[in-house]
Amino acid sequence: MIGLVQRVAHACAKVNGEVIGSIDEGLLVLLAVEPDDTERKAERLLDRISGYRIFADPNGKMNLSLKDVGGELLVVSQFTLAADTKKGMRPSFSSAASPELGERLYDHFVEKASALLSRVQTGRFGAEMEITLTNIGPTTFSLRVE
């Protein structure tokens, strides 16, 4: 399971021009599910993301987590992160989970995140979305749980 984590001042997900998820200070997570992923892997990735110390402490050092700062979370499904781009001029998506598994584990991740954090917003699984964000830093990390 892959999470592309971006520290944001604001992020928003729209479908057909309608805002379906929006946050202020926090993390935008683009989430990709791979064929061998499990609920346990989703929970491990959530633990890493929510505890990852990428927010500044009073001394300006990256020393605080999303939980520490009471930040918000926007989770967006992004199967293209699992693409195989090693050869050719077109990505292969055979390394992405089936839509059924992807949606089940995406929903599990969101459910667990909602129980752990005070404000969780989502995109819409499988939808064509417009994502806007203001990245702070920019600060972006790719986290993977195998």
UniProtKB/Swiss-Prot annotation:
Q: What does this protein do?
A: An aminoacyl-tRNA editing enzyme that deacylates mischarged D-aminoacyl-tRNAs. Also deacylates mischarged glycyl-tRNA(Ala), protecting cells against glycine mischarging by AlaRS. Acts via tRNA-based rather than protein-based catalysis; rejects L-amino acids rather than detecting D-amino acids in the active site. By recycling D-aminoacyl-tRNA to D-amino acids and free tRNA molecules, this enzyme counteracts the toxicity associated with the formation of D-aminoacyl-tRNA entities in vivo and helps enforce protein L-homochirality.
Alphabetically ordered keywords of this record: Cytoplasm, Hydrolase, RNA-binding, tRNA-binding
Q: PANTHER family recorded for this chain?
A: D-AMINOACYL-TRNA DEACYLASE 1, D-TYROSYL-TRNA TYR DEACYLASE
Tell me which Gene Ontology terms the entry assigns under biological process: D-amino acid catabolic process
Keyword flag Hydrolase: yes
Query: Which comment does the entry carry about domains?
Result: A Gly-cisPro motif from one monomer fits into the active site of the other monomer to allow specific chiral rejection of L-amino acids.
Q: What assembly does the database describe for this protein?
A: Homodimer.
Gene name, per UniProt, is dtd
What is this protein called in UniProt?
Answer: D-aminoacyl-tRNA deacylase
- Family annotation (Pfam families): Tyr_Deacylase
- Gene3D superfamilies hit by this protein: D-tyrosyl-tRNA(Tyr) deacylase (3.50.80.10)
Chief place of localization: cytoplasm
Protein family according to the UniProt entry: Belongs to the DTD family.
Gene Ontology terms: cellular component = cytoplasm
Q: Which reaction does it catalyse?
A: glycyl-tRNA(Ala) + H2O = tRNA(Ala) + glycine + H(+); a D-aminoacyl-tRNA + H2O = a tRNA + a D-alpha-amino acid + H(+)
Q: What is its EC number?
A: 3.1.1.96
Where is it localised? Cytoplasm
Coiled coil ranges (UniProt) are none
Q: Where is this motif: Gly-cisPro motif, important for rejection of L-amino acids?
A: 137-138
Q: Tell me the GO molecular function terms.
A: D-tyrosyl-tRNA(Tyr) deacylase activity; Gly-tRNA(Ala) deacylase activity; Ser(Gly)-tRNA(Ala) hydrolase activity; tRNA binding
